[in-house]
Amino acid sequence: MERVYYRYIFRLKSPLALGSGISDNTDSDVLLDSRGVPYIPATSIAGVIRHSVDEDTARELFGTIQNGSGEMSKVLTYDAVCTGENAVSVRDSVRLNNKVADDTGKFDFEAVETGAEFRGYIELADCGADGDSVINEAFQKINAGLLRFGHKTTRGYGTVAVEGLQRIGFSDADDWLDFDMFDDECWKNAQAVELTKPSDLTGITLSLKQRGGISIRRYSTDVSDGENAAPDYEQLSLRSGVPVIPGTSWAGAFRARFCEFAGEEKADGLFGHIEENVKQARNKKSAIYFSESMLDGGYYKTVTRNSIDRFTSGTNDGALYTEKTYYGGSTELELLFTEKQSDDVKRAVLAVIADLDNGFLSVGGLTSVGRGLFSVEKLCINGQDMTESFRNYDFDKLLEVW
């Protein structure tokens, strides 16, 4: 007999939107256990790991069901339960088409905020070296952001960092029976597992600097204290107050501009698409992953202004509103590519980034009055600093390392 156990911690690098199917608080409430604690179900973890291997290996390790009979999985996965403090926040979203909201496109959902930690366990039963290889490869991809949890995974949600990965194995039945994987004392002699980056990882990292304010709105119901006006809406932020730009905002802006450069067909191939009202729809998942960006180094500013009638140049009745926005911050945006792309597609992506740097592409709302502008301070492709080539618009040089 052979039993191998892995213990790990998933620390959220971006919000986790894992729906429970319940819509008591929002359109999609986060999954909670009986104590009200968020967790990642074992089925989700097993599904993500299984998806990372080829079909033959999947059948060998994860079991099969055929014609009413089958084999049990050799990989036993346990729920990863949130430890310590956690914060569940509500995200408001709206489906846009060329900056215009679609009818019935407003929705909200709950998400576990960035920084929460989840502890989980995996047991391998007589898997041999193949089992260790599969777990190591899967956790490398999870740690690199190629495998994520929940929904909206290509748009910045469900990214985790793998921390404290440990392995312990048993070939003696008595030693195995004495082992309790939930007891910290039993892991004292466990082996620490180091993870490396996948060799096939293709990514672009942008270091960005704000050129003005940002307006990705979260509407507020706070009441004024009599001295300071409570904002009608404010920049989207974490519970800790850190302002964020969700991957959905980046993806929408990038896709719209990419479509202008490369056309709808290539945009569907890179950003994915869904065929609605079609019986045999050929839907495609996005081949580009956007990160969620956290802003820092700037400051909040509360602005009160009027809406002006374009004909009379006078103020509109009831159109005084207050906004809390964020200025002068810096952030990073990471783009990961899961498929090889043609040079035409790569050039179009680089052209979109150039537009962002030159102020021709903005993110969020109120873009017509100067919000959402950024400059590219640094550009790295696959870990190599290519800022100078980008400044010279030497796309041929950039493609050499992509």
Residue ranges and their predicted role:
Residues 1-402:
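Small/polar/charged residue-enriched interaction surfaces, especially the RNA/DNA-contacting tracks
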